Amino acid sequence: MDFEIYLFDIEGTTTPIEFVHKILFPYSVGKFETFFRSNSLERKWIEKLLEEGKRDSTYSRQLTDSPQNLSDYCKYLVSVDRKSGPLKEIQGRIWKHGYENGELKSSLFADVPSFLKRIQSAKKKSAVYSSGSIEAQKLIFKYSDFGDLTEYFSAYFDTGVGGKRESASYSRIAEQLGIAPEKILFFTDIKEEADAARNAEFKTTLLERPGNAPQPKHSHPKISSFENFNP
């Protein structure tokens, strides 16, 4: 196929949704208060979290910078699956500690490692675009149940380039990669993300994995595995 870059979503694409929601999220929820009490987070991230809380009309409690209060707000953000930048930064740091001390090991779909190898063998490149922080993305592929797979990725993108349902985000990714958008194939499990990528002239493919939510009617190519996908 005439693509130069294969851009991967993580949750529901390379990694089972169940791992994210039943392992990673609960692990961070159990560590929030201890993390805030450790005073290891730079003040700028606390300020960003406080600013978000003040603007959050869905959160009824007053937000202060006490460890308990910050922890409660982060737990709330997880419960509503909010794609919050400060939350993702905090979770990434908590997960880093968990991976490094052996409490966490990431789960990948079995077809992912061999597909990454085929892409590399074809002299193409792989990259990641996820709502999780770049640090968290790297951890998932470094501490996977198939070993360290970070050698296969040339770039990582998070919501620093914009939201995943905004076409401008994909245009920024193409610009940063220095690749024409039509030479990039984006894999995701969410129709609206694929729509946004296609509007930026990316090529797209939707993954229909076990545990993924059914998607509205769409015209994107779809696959259930990378096993027979030739780069």
From Swiss-Prot:
What chemistry does it catalyse, as a reaction equation?
Answer: 5-methylsulfanyl-2,3-dioxopentyl phosphate + H2O = 1,2-dihydroxy-5-(methylsulfanyl)pent-1-en-3-one + phosphate
Extract the signal peptide range: none
Coiled-coil annotated residue ranges, if any:
none
InterPro entries in alphabetical order: Enolase-ppase_E1, HAD-like_sf, HAD-SF_hydro_IA, HAD_sf
Q: What is this protein called?
A: Enolase-phosphatase E1
Q: Which UniProt keywords apply?
A: Amino-acid biosynthesis, Hydrolase, Magnesium, Metal-binding, Methionine biosynthesis
Complex formation = Monomer.
- Extract one GO molecular function annotation from the record: 2,3-diketo-5-methylthiopentyl-1-phosphate enolase activity
Pfam families found in the cross-reference section: Hydrolase
Q: GO:BP terms for this protein?
A: L-methionine salvage from methylthioadenosine
How are cofactors bound according to the entry's free-text note?
Answer: Binds 1 Mg(2+) ion per subunit.
Function, please?
A: Bifunctional enzyme that catalyzes the enolization of 2,3-diketo-5-methylthiopentyl-1-phosphate (DK-MTP-1-P) into the intermediate 2-hydroxy-3-keto-5-methylthiopentenyl-1-phosphate (HK-MTPenyl-1-P), which is then dephosphorylated to form the acireductone 1,2-dihydroxy-3-keto-5-methylthiopentene (DHK-MTPene).
Q: Which HAMAP family match?
A: Salvage_MtnC (MF_01681)
Q: What is its EC number?
A: 3.1.3.77
Stored CDD domains = HAD_EP
Q: Where is this region: Disordered?
A: 206-231
Pathway where this protein functions: Amino-acid biosynthesis; L-methionine biosynthesis via salvage pathway; L-methionine from S-methyl-5-thio-alpha-D-ribose 1-phosphate: step 3/6; Amino-acid biosynthesis; L-methionine biosynthesis via salvage pathway; L-methionine from S-methyl-5-thio-alpha-D-ribose 1-phosphate: step 4/6
| Cofactor entry | Mg(2+)
Q: Which organism is it from?
A: Leptospira borgpetersenii serovar Hardjo-bovis (strain JB197)
Give the family this protein belongs to, as stated in its UniProt record.
Belongs to the HAD-like hydrolase superfamily. MasA/MtnC family.
Enzyme's top EC category: hydrolase
